[in-house]
Amino acid sequence: MDSIGCASTQIDSDTDGISDANPEGLTTATGKWANAFQARLVNQGLTCHVKNGDEFTIAMLEKHVWICAFMLVGASHGGCTVGEVESTYTKEFEALASEMMTAGAAALNVDVADGYLDRLKAYARAVSHFPTAVKEFEWRNGWFYKLTCDAVKAGREDPMPLHTQALYDLKLPLPIAWIN
């Protein structure tokens, strides 16, 4: 089976994943067809980088932490915009994103370069109007929640207590089967 993996950050045609911290854009692809995919995007005036191995995994993890942490903090504050999270709740975002990045990097066995919080916040400024909500739980925050459940089942402490508490505070229907 042939496949392509993408870590795309395009929300609007005018941002294309470009931020003040990443003027080269953030859209990233990997896999057998990554170069063909990149060519199609570039042909349409968009950016795309081909990355493999840990380099792609790190790009994917940063994107995943971005969407999960910004959405969770925003939802915790009435569904405010990404820009409001970045400007008003920045310390809360930084604490949550830091614990998620640490746990995610450990689970994926990668080292994320310093400055990731600045990169994540810069992208938020580029799409500041984007609304927040916790959606697609199984594929987004659910991945982090599963890391927590696995740790607890193994007799270890919750690696992301801020994340877990925020999920509980929102009264989300969390999958109990993951805990047992």
Predicted features and spans:
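Inter-helical turn/loop segments and adjacent helix faces that build the functional surface
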Residues: 48-51, 82-83, 151-156
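Rossmann-fold dinucleotide-binding core
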Residues: 1-62
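NAD(P)-dependent Rossmann-like dehydrogenase/reductase catalytic/cofactor-binding core
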Residues: 35, 42, 91-180
